[in-house]
Amino acid sequence: MSDRKLSTREDADVLLEEELKEPRRFRVLLHNDDYTSMDFVVAVLIDIFRKSREQAMSIMLSVHEKGIGVCGVYTAEVAETKVAMVHARARAEGFPLRCSMEEV
């Protein structure tokens, strides 16, 4: 917190409002491609996003049928980390799986 003195009630209200702001949230998305196996997508969803097998299957089918699927909603740092983890794992396994994030 800053060392400056609060001179009015308005200053206190502004500082309190700033302290209570919710962090920005981001959807993490998986994108369909013609090469990544469905089994690999399910494994990524279970291992990286901590989805149940049923949830992972549902998201994987959305990716397959609609071209995109939502893995979850996270703060910016968590979303960035999960995107990087997906890309690293996909590259290590030789898949071109794309993962992205968008602000909610």
Swiss-Prot record:
One BP annotation, GO: proteolysis
Pfam families per the UniProt record, alphabetical: ClpS
Domain of life: Bacteria
Assembly: Binds to the N-terminal domain of the chaperone ClpA.
Function noted in UniProt: Involved in the modulation of the specificity of the ClpAP-mediated ATP-dependent protein degradation.
Stated family: Belongs to the ClpS family.
Record protein name field: ATP-dependent Clp protease adapter protein ClpS
Organism in which the protein naturally occurs: Oleidesulfovibrio alaskensis (strain ATCC BAA-1058 / DSM 17464 / G20)
Organism ancestry: Bacteria, Pseudomonadati, Thermodesulfobacteriota, Desulfovibrionia, Desulfovibrionales
